[in-house]
Amino acid sequence: MIGLGVALSQKGEHPGSHMAQAAASRQVTPEGRTSIDRPYVAANSDETIRLPVRARRWHAKILRACLRDSTGKQARALALVAPEDVLRTLPASAALHRVVGPLHESLRESLPPDAAGRLDALFREECARHLLVTSNLRRVQELLERAGIPFLVVKGPAVAALAYRRPRIRFYQDLDIVVRRQHFATALDLFEANGAQVVDPNWPYHSEHVAGELRLSTGVDLHWHLLFFQELRSATAIRMDEIFSRERPVSLAGTTVLTTDPADTLIHLSLHACLEGGSRLIWLKDIERSIANDAPAWEDVIERSLRWRVNLFVGTMLMRSRSVLDTPVPDEVVATLLPSRAWRATLSAADRLFPIASPRRRETPATLVAQGMQVDVKSTVSFLTRVAARRGLTSAAELFRRQGEEADTGAHVSAGEERAAFLARVASGP
């Protein structure tokens, strides 16, 4: 038996969680809130960040400098003139944006002792998670290869290895594994037989939305598609067989696994970031590093994004990454992916008025527009209008209670039957 590692707890919200993924389907989550109603939570902390505007602005400048200048000179120059109280709270903002590694490398010696101590603690936690993920990778590889199940490793570890010249500063908190839909049930059975558990076994919910991912207690996110919700998969045209056909090898943790090709990687990073609101600097940095060091062909990015009907998602994040981190995205690429000049102006205005690098407790118009993105501008505006109206008429908790009461009137079905129904829906899809 190959035991899978035990995930560290208290990581803050997880990007694959239903709370976060609800932005794609625009449904009320099992917890009773939509993703656009949740506060931002600092990674490794149960406390929401509460900072005055002055501190947020300083943090934005310093963190952007850490990411724009790998030598750390710009960040250290800012730290020399920054107020001490700003520097003391900087580690919390770095944790929120998941850029503890770059901050630690650039500014650890320039921080006040108490702030340096907090940053060291965060750095050690990230190192521990890194070791857990790499350990899980080797175990997952052995388990799936023994069963003859092809798989891809996406996001965190693969991006760190391929796009970062200094991958040791790009930490990650979980292991994203993609299998073909016909192998999903078998892979899940294997993981469960070796100690894993589904974190949220809400099988009726998973079945209703034909969930494209299950988060396991071992820090593994098991996917059969890049998108969580059937509603968004139906509106777009991503074909996983096509993505698997372009797989390429990557060396990770002393072994070789497969991941997506450069264009598919950039599209996936942008799509994931957009559906999460594009609110973390690390996601924008991943995009920047992928373009700089993993060099996708722009014609492939454009052609696939348009054909898959995800061009608005991709274009929005490319434009945001360019604005925040000077990512080298050609104007013609942005204009092709976002053909409406008025829409580009709207996105630019939102990003300018509500800068992503400035840590905030709650979503802003800039993050809401990204989370609410649909396959075209008209649908996006319509959805955002409905969200605004819903917020004015009823609370998410009240809506959830009514839905829960309606659901309770149905006949009881065992958890095993509900699980089987979900897996059958996954296996029988197009």
Task: Give residue spans per PLM region.
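Conserved NTP-donor binding/palm subdomain of two-metal-ion nucleotidyltransferases/polymerases, i.e.
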Residues: A20, R26, G32, I36-Q173, ...
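Short helix-onset patch at the extreme N-terminus, typifying the N->h transition
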Residues: A7, S25-R26
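Extreme N-terminal basic, low-complexity initiation segments
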Residues: I2-K11
